[in-house]
Amino acid sequence: MDIKHGYAGQILRVNLSTGQFSTVPTGSYADRFLGGRGVALKIYWDEVIPQLDAFDPENCLIFMTGPLCGVPGFAGSRWQVCGKSPILNQFSYANLGGAWGARLKFAGYDGLVLKGKADSLVYLSINNETVALKDASHLKDKGAIESREILKDELGDSFCVVTTGPAGENMVTSATLLADSDSSGSSGFGALMGAKNIKAIAVNGHGKIDVADKKAVKLMRQKVRELKYDPFIWPTTLSQERMEKDICFGCINGCMRVKYHPANGRSGKYCCQSAGYYEVRAQRFYGKVTDVPFQATKLCDDYGIDTRAVETLMMWLSRCHKAHILSEDETGLPLSKMGSLEFIQTLLRKIAFREGFGDVLAEGTLKAANIVGKSADRYITDYMIKTGEDSPYGPRMHITTGLLYATEPRMPIQQLHEVGLPVLLWALRAGGNSDALLKNNYMTSEVIRAISKKFWGDEIAADFSTFEGKALSAAKIQDRQYAKESLILCDFSWPITHSPITDDHVGDPTLESQVCSAVTGMNMDETDLDKIGQRVFNLQRAVLAREDRKGRASDTIEEFNFTIPLKAEFGNPDCIVPGRNGEVFSRKGMVLDRQKFEKMKDEYYAIRGWDVSTGLQTKTKLEALGLGDIAKALQQEDLLV
């Protein structure tokens, strides 16, 4: 495929074992898979054999942008990281914001593939066309924030840096990547950096991205900016006076992401789950509002540890301490001081450097519970999913999300947001708290039903008292989100399901295809773009099938969804959702009906064009999606019907 607009045109490949560099044309992947997750998946399919261990040097660590990256005004400069995750030893993904992805594109590369392992600790420098591996021994054991700042001082402030902390160097399974503006990526990819002996990737570029239709791009930029004006307010106990907006490169109007300026002067990003993971515990311990939650977030960023993994870990540690399964003496942790700065400093240091009991915790909560024994694993059975994360927007409340959790290799937060955020806004309004997250909250029952009809296939998908319409809704959400992850667009901004300026407050599902057409010159409509999303999703399904996630038997969710009644949901303690005809319906005290869930899977498989009895993909469907080569390979491995 000859690509002229929206792409840099090549993907950089680095063999860390040999120190060799090469490039491949982006066009050989972009015709079918567009960019981002799609292109990364095809590279992974081609090069990572199923039996390979995550820490094997031959595992690829793939950094990929999309065709909208570097084009201002669309919130399209996020970038995808993919590889075999050490958490479950299977394919997974993460995406990050900031400006690193755009800078890579300006340097002349749509993506970067790392393979092999360096003999000693190195960092990769990409300065326009000049690429070099350099000694990073002076960064050993240093934090991710500190390492980033050291490299920017050495190379110049125009460089953007992605790095990992000591947790990555010591291959902690929840180790993160940290880029500019404190953007972080999960799935344990910091540990893959450590396994490959690469500390950081510093990028500087001054190129430009050509667009196909400058006039159309300008008009779409203005249209999107007007539609998307909905100022979120993140609920926090910290001082609003110390916060300022922190906007990623090429954003539309900003989001809830802020930069916080604490009393000690060390400012940084404060956003979403990472902002609040220690807030309640700290306030309970100190009895007042402090900067400790922010410091806890920065500690995770600097050590390179996933805040969500730490949050679920702390719940387990607290329960085990109360049950006298774990003591302060045997763990070396001040468990009685959970919520204090001392506790979180000690916990994170021990995990990052694998000190004492920290070596056990570094393997993740699920493995740690099995190692500890003494029935410690029963204290995670009511909230934790297979990757060691919690389960926000869970299926006991939202039903649709059961299929999203069941068919993904990790918590699919982008997909969950498309369902959960409109429902949360509706619940805040229905519960009389209309201004908590969105000024002038207009999310009435009529609006959410109209959104459901336009985006999820039918109004009935917004009735959460029934399973009806949820299978179609799940499929449509996944197709849209996979196209979004290939463009790649920001989750806070896209899809634009609702707007304060339209007469009915409903957004437009065709916007993504309009923007893509204007930038790339690929004339496509909503159906065309959704087909790309469906193709990418099916490629991921094929990848996971080769890694022993084989259809219906693997499309499962945790047992607590069927057995433990729902107690509360974030921001929605009464668990209210839209019911029949938009009436208020509470799912508090409810569980997911197992038989209805399996029947919903039947319907979902049929919609997907897969075999209903096994959940395996079919040759007919894959060929219809232009994946005949994938179908042939799966057929040879007896993974196709």
Mark where each language-model region is:
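Extended C-terminal regions of large enzymes
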Residues: S77, K152-S187, M193-V641
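Basic, polar low-complexity surface loops/patches
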Residues: M1-K245, D302, L366
